[in-house]
């Protein structure tokens, strides 16, 4: 599930996923179609109706109740936007407070570097 409250972002993701990779495409659909439950990747703003094992949160989207049980929950945000950084920190605190494992990754010099990690409470 790719979740964004921004309709323009959802439309851009939809268009991009039809075009890449060059030798194919990533099967997906926009939320609200007749086959939402069958989509390998569902793009929308609501809950995952496609048995998603992971949720990608974009543009300040919030996790929904029960999504802490997902295999993975990604929060993508602009590290140069203080409001987005503060919101991501709040999500980190809430999610780790629920006992979820968490990792913070930052893009540096064209590669991803893990900055910190919180293991689940045992």
Model-identified regions with their sequence ranges:
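Conserved RecA-like ASCE P-loop NTPase motor core of nucleic-acid helicases/translocases
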Residues: 1-6
């Amino acid at each position: 599930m790719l979740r964004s409250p921004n309709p323009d972002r959802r439309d851009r993701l939809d268009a991009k996923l039809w075009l890449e990779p060059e030798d194919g495409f990533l099967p997906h659909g926009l939320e609200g179609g007749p086959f939402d439950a069958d989509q390998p990747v569902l793009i929308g703003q609501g809950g995952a109706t496609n048995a998603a094992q992971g949720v990608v949160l974009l543009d300040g989207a919030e996790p929904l109740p029960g999504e802490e049980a997902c295999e993975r929950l990604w929060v993508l945000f602009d590290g140069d936007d203080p409001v987005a950084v503060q919101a991501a920190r709040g999500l980190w605190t809430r999610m780790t407070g629920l006992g979820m494992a968490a990792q913070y990754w930052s893009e540096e010099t064209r590669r991803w570097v893990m900055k910190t990690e919180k293991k689940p409470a045992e």
